[in-house]
């Protein structure tokens, strides 16, 4: 996993979780079925929109160049100091990964760092 809504209290996390609860009936952060998919789509959509705005066009090369020059962005997954560069086209790293498990009542919960097995 690279994201869970559990324990997240950023403005973006509160806004997105509220929308999921309102529009999709999600009862709580542990019931977001694909928090990773939601977070990746949210962050990438916003980064791409910023790059298109910066480029002033949807031309592929110009958007790529603009993405490589984006400044800081407060996303769901993390605060991206510089999401992409000319030599790094992956905004996340191994430090963003954690393990999670489904409970018997179908909640997706992170496994605390340093634990060798789920609680």
Model-derived features: positions:
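Extracytosolic ligand-binding ectodomains
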Residues: 1-119
């Amino acid at each position: 996993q690279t994201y869970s809504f559990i324990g997240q209290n950023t403005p973006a996390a509160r806004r997105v979780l509220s929308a999921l609860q309102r529009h999709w009936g999600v009862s709580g952060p542990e019931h977001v079925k694909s928090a990773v998919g939601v977070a990746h789509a949210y962050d990438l959509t916003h980064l791409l929109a910023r790059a298109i705005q910066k480029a002033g066009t949807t031309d592929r090369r110009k958007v790529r160049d603009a993405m490589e020059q984006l400044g800081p962005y407060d996303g769901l997954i993390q605060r991206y100091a510089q999401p992409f560069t000319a030599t790094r086209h992956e905004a996340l790293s191994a430090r963003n990964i954690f393990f999670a498990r489904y409970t018997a009542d179908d909640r997706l919960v992170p496994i605390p760092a340093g634990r060798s097995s789920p609680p």
